[in-house]
């Protein structure tokens, strides 16, 4: 069993990435041989609209994952499960075109069934409080009989993960966590400290800089700048049309590195290069 000191800091990231086109081509990929089990915890609709951008990316590549949960977990702001359901509605409209290019996409109803409401608001000083639908779902998924771990991709605060670990500490050996840290650390300081102090052996990647590789650089030559929306995203299905609502179409997609980490390379070895970065202790 792969075990390593569980807090990793971003070392380097090399990305070549194209998003939100109906024709999907992946070149130079080191495909994961078995679909990873994933659960996404997101503060979509909360403090940062880039979660909608990354959710669009996830939905367009959802055939690559065995998705077991989509949890709304906004430490701040007014995000809710409805924000997830709204994105799935757009995905449902685009699905016929997506199916023309590749098989294996989950049905919209299957995705709706695994949308759960987590905590709305930051955890108190002790780092946990009462169970939520989202934290209970994390426990249920983690406890499934499987030879594969449940990868929990955290796009916001750690509040529901901390609650799940508090209520069911036995799951710590059944999950692996990739957390988009950075600003999210200040939104869920209490739950972060609780996890670090009480679960030192939890398999946990803390990625504090990977998202910077996705933020639009207006000065960059070519199409990978503020013109990217007009050249590559505008009119690309319902998800593409929706994209303009978030940062006026400028690409941020700060949570996407967690998806890329699962799509390429060896997720069990964070020290090797992958699309989602390589990490050191």
Outline where the language-model segments fall.
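Bacterial Sec-dependent N-terminal signal peptides
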Residues: 1-30
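N-terminal acidic, glycine/proline-rich low-complexity segments
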Residues: 29-281
